Amino acid sequence: MADVLERVTKIIVDRLGVEETEVVPAASFKEDLGADSLDVVELVMQLEDEFEMEISDEDAEKIATVGDAVTYIESHL
């Protein structure tokens, strides 16, 4: 999990301009990290590129927190 979490954290920090310490598994992209809907779509696209996978729109809607993203990626690698 550490490797996936580290890679996800780097993408979030780069995309949203938040501090690395704010990117914890329980952090909500919208409420805690200040992302808007477009930011979330762009994050999903970056995660798809980084992990060489496709995340369906239906699954993307269920990814609301950093932990959700890490869990999803780990279960689909």
UniProtKB/Swiss-Prot annotation:
PROSITE patterns linked: CARRIER, PHOSPHOPANTETHEINE
Gene3D superfamilies (alphabetical): ACP-like
SUPFAM superfamilies: ACP-like
Domain of life: Bacteria
Modification sites for O-(pantetheine 4'-phosphoryl)serine: 37
Key words of the record: Cytoplasm, Fatty acid biosynthesis, Fatty acid metabolism, Lipid biosynthesis, Lipid metabolism, Phosphopantetheine, Phosphoprotein
Pathway: Lipid metabolism; fatty acid biosynthesis
Keyword Zinc: no
InterPro entries to which the protein is assigned, alphabetical: ACP, ACP-like_sf, PP-bd_ACP, Ppantetheine_attach_site
Domain Carrier residue range list: 2-77
Function: Carrier of the growing fatty acid chain in fatty acid biosynthesis.
Protein family (similarity comment): Belongs to the acyl carrier protein (ACP) family.
HAMAP family per UniProt: Acyl_carrier (MF_01217)
Name under which the protein is recorded: Acyl carrier protein
